[in-house]
Amino acid sequence: MVVSSAKIHPASVVEDGAVIGENVKVGPFCHIGPNVVLGDGVELLSHVVVIGRTTIGKGTKIFPGAVIGGDSQSVHHSAVDTTLVIGENCTIREGVTMNTGTVEHGGTTVVGNNNLFLAYSHVAHDCRLGNNIILSNNVMLAGHVTVEDRAILGGGSAVHQFTRVGKQAFIGGLSAVSYDVIPYGMLNGNPGVLSGLNVVGMTRAGFERPVIHAVRRCYKQIFEGPESIRANAAAVRDEYLDCPPAMEILDFIAAESDRALSSPNRGGKG
């Protein structure tokens, strides 16, 4: 279904069954598959491929060369309908690729709202991305990766499958992220190691200095304490019940995960 207010270039292909919302703009040489839903105001500039069971939220803009909704690249991929859901007001730049999920793990790849994907970044099968995230050029997310709100991943960084990147974490360019990165953490290098807190990001987000100081103290207690990371975190939990960002870090550490935790030293720890 294509509404009358949509503008589709005659050189593009919209297959029967696709749902095209109000004021959608599709430039030349795009291909929209039969199971695609484009929300109101979505814009495909040119040479964009949107296939699979893909839903794109209103106001999202996609640049040339992007391939959105292709099958999972997992060697265990089954030829069963799976989905990709992209939220509202995302910007998806040139050459970006995003895959649908796998039936073995729920079947859906989810991308939130207001995210920026720079050129040639990749979102693999079954990833879960929050809101207001930036993936810089050539960032690679393997399957089942979780990226929480307001995280920033520097150019060329690569994230191992099943890894979690916490809220407002900052990943330096060309870093190899093999283990979970705590909220507000900064990680750099290959192999990636924690290099402290994303204080600049916390300041820009409006956290006051006493709160940032408290989170720094919590960070030191967790990673410089006498026991394991998780034991240290559990031991100091009651000290930070009134400090939401510190509690986000502590809750993140306490949660179940398939990966160990990134630390200031090489190698993941628990």
Swiss-Prot record:
CDD domains: LbH_UDP-GlcNAc_AT. Pathway: Glycolipid biosynthesis; lipid IV(A) biosynthesis; lipid IV(A) from (3R)-3-hydroxytetradecanoyl-[acyl-carrier-protein] and UDP-N-acetyl-alpha-D-glucosamine: step 1/6. Its EC number is 2.3.1.129. Gene3D superfamilies: Hexapeptide repeat proteins, Udp N-acetylglucosamine O-acyltransferase, C-terminal domain. Its main location: cytoplasm. Keywords: Acyltransferase, Cytoplasm, Lipid A biosynthesis, Lipid biosynthesis, Lipid metabolism, Repeat, Transferase. One of its GO terms (cellular component) is membrane. Transmembrane segments: none annotated. One of its GO terms (biological process) is lipid A biosynthetic process. Involved in the biosynthesis of lipid A, a phosphorylated glycolipid that anchors the lipopolysaccharide to the outer membrane of the cell. Homotrimer. This is Acyl-[acyl-carrier-protein]--UDP-N-acetylglucosamine O-acyltransferase. It comes from Sinorhizobium fredii (strain NBRC 101917 / NGR234). The lineage of its organism: Bacteria, Pseudomonadati, Pseudomonadota, Alphaproteobacteria, Hyphomicrobiales. The gene is lpxA.
